[in-house]
Every structure is written in structure tokens, then in C-alpha cells.
Amino acid sequence: MIPGEIITLPEDQEIILNAGRPTLDIMVSNKGDRPIQVGSHYHFLEVNEDLEFYEIDSESKNFIFIDRSNLHNKTRGMRLNIPAGTAVRFEPGDIKKVQLVPLAGTREIYGFNGKINGQLDSSVEQ
């Protein structure tokens, strides 16, 4: 190996991110008047409050509002399922479908908007 060398798969092979991990598809709407950008590993429950989340009903295809004041909603412990170091930008009025994947590792959340600040699976919200 040469220092700084990047070794990739052959061109005919795809790199599959988060293979075999559970995912959640939701719709996200920017109700604010400014663009909002969310990074790859940002705890999605704690993103800017101007973003509204909706589940997609599998039968009717209708949107079902996800209450963000409930800290145990489906986005808890989830992040965007995109390559590390990248982000998704939501322009004012945008409605986008995004895929979320559970945070891995120790599943401890500190900082962000201060809603968890501890172990995800047993934290006391502040």
C-alpha cells in the first residue's frame, strides 16, 4: 500500500452502504424560509424544527404526520442513509423522500439540540 492510496472495488462492483441494516423511508418538508442542510451522521430527531416529517402509509400512500415533540418517535436514533461526509439540502417549500438508518456504535447521543444527551436506548430526556 502506498500512503494516501485509495483502494476501491472494480468498476463492475457496487459499494453497498449499510447492507443488511434496517431502514425507514419518510417524507421531509421544509416549512421555513431558509435552506436547511442535514449532514450524514446528524441525529435526525434533532434537526431544525422547520423540517416536518411524514410517514408514508403503505396502503393508501397518504402522508401521516410524525410528532417531533414525542422524543420516542420513529426518527429517534436514526440518521440519513447517505455516504459519510455528505449532506441533504432542503430548500424552503421542498418535500423530499429520505431514507434513515439507525446510528451504530455505542448509540450514545451528545450535543446536537440537547434532546437526548446520553445512551439512546435508556436515556432520560432533558
UniProtKB/Swiss-Prot annotation:
Its main location: cytoplasm. This is Urease subunit beta. GO terms for biological process: urea catabolic process. Belongs to the urease beta subunit family. The keyword Cytoplasm applies. Pfam families: Urease_beta (PF00699). It catalyses: urea + 2 H2O + H(+) = hydrogencarbonate + 2 NH4(+). PANTHER family: UREASE. The keyword Metal-binding does not apply. InterPro entries: Urease_beta-like, Urease_betasu_sf, Urease_subunit. Keywords: Cytoplasm, Hydrolase. Pathway: Nitrogen metabolism; urea degradation; CO(2) and NH(3) from urea (urease route): step 1/1. GO terms for molecular function: urease activity. GO terms for cellular component: urease complex. It is found in: Cytoplasm. Its EC number is 3.5.1.5. Heterotrimer of UreA (gamma), UreB (beta) and UreC (alpha) subunits. Three heterotrimers associate to form the active enzyme. Gene3D superfamilies: Urease, beta subunit. HAMAP family: Urease_beta (MF_01954). Coiled coil: none annotated.
